Amino acid sequence: MVEFTVFKGSREGKIVQSTTKKDIKSDEVLIKVTHSGLCGTDEHFKRIDMVLGHEGAGVVEFSQEIGAAVTTYAKGDSVGWGYQHDSCNHCKQCLTGHETLCPERAMYGYHDHDQGSFAYYAIWKADYIFRIPDSIPREFAAPLQCGGATVYNALRSFDTKPSHRVGIIGIGGLGHLAIQFASKMGCHVTVFSSTDSKRDEAMKLGANEFVTTKGVKELQVSGKIDHLLICTSFQPDWKQFLPIMAPGGTLYPLTVSQDDLTIPYMPILEGELKVQGSLVAARAVHNEMLAFAAQHQIRPLIEKFPMTVEGIEACMKKLEEGNMRYRGVLIAP
């Protein structure tokens, strides 16, 4: 039995420090958490009595605490985990590398409410943790576990090619990573933002083109967009964006929202446009994302906070106010 400190949400929306006790099963690994990213999804669960956080990074603990059936990790290995914790491993989706769509998938917010990455330790199935490349410090690896995996999966899994033009709406926690990944994939990257305030930063991250949208009736771009990643917490003005989509282009809503997707009908029909759902990356794609980030030196831009009640609340407040540049990272003691 292992006992460790965790940080939970509450009905009042306050962060509560608590304790979790868990046994380590034969196929599980005990991880000393060193860093956790703060994702916008965490905001949606802060009023629930559950341990928060799903962008974890840490170190595998001493060998006698590693599950008896685990042979892939050893003491001191740098590892991370993300949104998914388990699947059935025998359905069609699991057997074809799409375990994120498994009917029995275990996902953050819906399963394992007694632990998360806002904690000093975590115990996860070895099959659902990921080895972090030595060249990526864990403070940068943590936000990649969900934010990086989300944008990489959209770019990687739906036939994006280096010759394609990728549009990215919003330069926040997801958008600033999407710019880097799309640029390093060889795509022409057009960034859309309401104002000019983040233009210089977007260009430094790898954007080829920057377009402001506020007060503009018709967007002017150098070429039609093949893939449009929506990385804002609100739906864009589709009357602005649908006219700049290439025939057969794809729209990717990537942020969590409880609102209905409302979009003009005829432009979708006439342009043979697609609206493509994209969850987080399956394990093979997740590992590929980490290797790609290591090879191309992709790093999130982060702000650090202590992993305490006060630190977590300050981090979440800054994100809520829209002032985070661009991913908050909690540092465990």
Describe the role of every protein-language-model region:
Residues 1-4, 184, 283-333:
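C-terminal hydrophobic helical "lid"/dimerization subdomain
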Residues 21-36, 45-92, 133-136:
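Glycine-rich beta-strand-centered segment in the early N-terminal region that forms part
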Residues 87-169:
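NAD(P)H dinucleotide-binding glycine-rich loop of Rossmann-like/cofactor-binding domains
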Residues 162-171, 181-240:
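Adenosine-nucleotide cofactor-binding segment
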Residues 175-176:
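N-terminal Rossmann-fold NAD(P) dinucleotide-binding loop
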Residues 192-196, 255, 279:
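N-terminal Rossmann-fold cofactor-binding loop
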Residues 245-247:
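Helix-to-beta-strand junctions that scaffold the AdoMet/dcAdoMet cofactor pocket
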Residues 255-271, 283-290:
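Rossmann-fold NAD(P)-binding glycine/threonine-rich loop
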